[in-house]
Every structure is written in C-alpha cells, then in structure tokens.
C-alpha cells in the first residue's frame, strides 16, 4: 500500500496484511485516484464546482459557506505546516467542543495529510495523556478554554511537541 505519509507510524501499526479486509473497488462509484485527500473531495471540490456560496455548516448564531470553511481550513493548514512543522502522517490532537472551528481544524489536518486525533472536551489530563501516548500525537490544536488539562497532559508526555490555542 503506497502512502504520501512521511511519518509512517499509522502504516507501521496496521495489522498484518493477512488480517486486513480485502478492499474491492470494482464499482465505478468506488474507483478513486491512487492519491486521495478527503478534504479535497469533501470541501474543496464544492468550491471548485461553483457551490462555494452555499451553506456548509451551521451552529447557533453561525453559518459558514463552503468557501468560508475552506478559507479557514486553509489558514489553519498553513499554520500547521509553516509554523508548527507538521508533515504528512503526523498525528494532530484536536481538543475542542463540537463547533464550526473544530470542523475547520479537522479539515486543515486532512489537507496537510496528517491524522486527526479528536478528543472529547470532558477528558481529564490523565485520559488525554493515554491518548497522546498511544497515538504518539506530536502536535495539538486546542480551544483556549480546554487548554489547562492538555498542558498538564503534555507535561507528562515527551511525544507532544507543540500546542496551539
């Protein structure tokens, strides 16, 4: 299986090939290019095909179009790569409530080829430490209100290198 991941942790931790399912993509609607980025298919394609002004995500008091979500995800993706040094295959912990900005962060992680490790806001530092260590999450995006437990977890983990609020 070929991958664009520079960090091969996920691929290296798959079950042996004989224990993996057989993937059959024989139907036309299941034929995908050799390299596929889900952010390109789920978000960017809508903008490219002229649907950028349509509502994409709604929350109380907020409504973003595909173009607005794409713009936010692109900005976050630039921070991930240029400022935080994320490379394809890195695990990026996401710590936020279910809101539009969390969706933008998830798409940004997908755009850069990293792996999103989403966490629930109710998790405590000890539980976050377990997730960080098992996933070997090297970077984190965190809503400011949830930062205290993540900082405490990061202090106990040599793996997590950078947190952005």
Task: Specify the residue positions occupied by each region the protein language model found.
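Conserved AMP-binding/adenylate-forming
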Residues: 62-64, 79-126
């Amino acid at each position: 299986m070929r991958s664009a991941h520079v960090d091969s942790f996920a691929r290296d931790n798959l079950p042996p090939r004989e224990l993996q399912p057989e993937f059959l993509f024989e139907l036309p609607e299941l034929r995908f290019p050799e390299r596929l980025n889900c952010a390109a298919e789920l978000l960017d394609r809508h903008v490219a095909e002229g649907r950028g002004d349509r509502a994409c995500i709604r929350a109380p008091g907020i409504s973003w179009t595909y173009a607005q979500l794409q713009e936010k995800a692109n900005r976050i993706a630039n921070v991930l790569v240029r400022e935080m040094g994320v490379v394809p295959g890195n695990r990026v912990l996401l710590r936020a409530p279910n809101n539009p900005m969390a969706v933008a962060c998830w798409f940004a992680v997908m755009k850069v080829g990293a792996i999103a490790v989403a966490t629930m806001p109710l998790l405590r530092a000890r539980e976050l430490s377990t997730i960080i260590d098992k996933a070997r999450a090297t970077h984190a995006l965190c809503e400011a209100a949830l930062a205290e437990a993540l900082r405490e977890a990061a202090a106990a983990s040599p793996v997590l290198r950078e947190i952005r609020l």
